[in-house]
Amino acid sequence: MAKKVDKVVKLQIPAGKANPAPPVGPALGQAGVNIMGFCKEFNARTQDQAGLIIPVEISVYEDRSFTFITKTPPAPVLLKKAAGIEKGSGEPNKTKVATVTKDQVREIANSKMQDLNAADEEAAMRIIEGTARSMGIVVE
């Protein structure tokens, strides 16, 4: 018989840098998870993606065991990396902070495809372009 899921914890953690300090420790401690076990496993699984923020969904079972799924980094993080900027514009409709090419948008859309609610590559690109627009990034 399959184990029954007790809780689902969603976090965004820098790749390879999970440690028992907040926000990871308190969130997992409340769920009764072995915090160091999670941190070691997460860091091993994400060490090749250093510098990116990785969303993770942790399923905690009734017997306090857990499994987790790592997702692709959020689109704004990938857009900031592609554009080479620290943060988006405070007034995106007035102040443009950077420019990305269609090819960069296509690359981001392809990497995010599994997490986006899009039927095809074009729809995924439109989603990423909308995110870029709301950050004050121009798509050429």
From Swiss-Prot:
Keywords attached to this entry: Methylation, Ribonucleoprotein, Ribosomal protein, RNA-binding, rRNA-binding
Biological process annotations from GO: translation
CDD domains, per the entry: Ribosomal_L11
Post-translational modification: One or more lysine residues are methylated.
GO cellular component: cytosolic large ribosomal subunit
Domain of life: Bacteria
Disulfide bond residue pairs: none
Recorded GO MF terms: large ribosomal subunit rRNA binding; structural constituent of ribosome
Family named by the database record: Belongs to the universal ribosomal protein uL11 family.
Known role: Forms part of the ribosomal stalk which helps the ribosome interact with GTP-bound translation factors.
PANTHER family: 60S RIBOSOMAL PROTEIN L12, LARGE RIBOSOMAL SUBUNIT PROTEIN UL11M
HAMAP family reported for this sequence: Ribosomal_uL11 (MF_00736)
Subunit composition and interactions: Part of the ribosomal stalk of the 50S ribosomal subunit. Interacts with L10 and the large rRNA to form the base of the stalk. L10 forms an elongated spine to which L12 dimers bind in a sequential fashion forming a multimeric L10(L12)X complex.
Protein's UniProt name: Large ribosomal subunit protein uL11
